[in-house]
Amino acid sequence: MKLKNVLIVVNDIEKSKKFYKDLFGLDVVLDNDGNVILTEGLVLQDAKIWKEFINKDITSHNHATELYFETTDIEEFGKKLDAYHEPIEYVNRLMEHSWGQKVIRFYDLDGNLIEVGSWISAD
């Protein structure tokens, strides 16, 4: 068995597709009207449909999960994020951990937590 996808709930599929394309370069692999699979295995699920599926309230900003991305140029990504046309809610702007990795944490348009870190060698 292997993990195939990670699903996040979004309020506006079109805005979310644009967000993940513009900032992370993710393309649409499959669009099933309310359920969109992007490259890298990220799935965007329409909030109204998801609520019907699970019959539970959806909790934004739950801080229980995060999407993690790595980049070779974290400073350039930070500039790209600052210039994005939608407001970005930061958890922390560019910071450096004690082990030398630089990271930025923020929420997507629907309160899903994202971390972008500088690539560090496993050596």
What are these regions (language model features)?
Residues 1-15, 65-67, 120-123:
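N-terminal beta-strand motif that seeds the catalytic metal site of vicinal oxygen chelate
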Residues 1-3, 59-64, 97-98:
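Short glycine-enriched loop/turn motifs at secondary-structure junctions
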Residues 8, 98, 105, 116-123:
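Short beta->alpha transition motifs characteristic of CBS
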Residues 8, 29, 93-96:
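Short beta-strand-to-loop elements that line the ligand-binding cleft
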Residues 13, 67-113:
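Vicinal oxygen chelate
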Residues 14-26:
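Amphipathic alpha-helical segments
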Residues 25-30, 87-91:
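Short secondary-structure junctions
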Residues 27-61, 113-118:
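Conserved short beta-strand elements that form part of the metal-binding/catalytic scaffold
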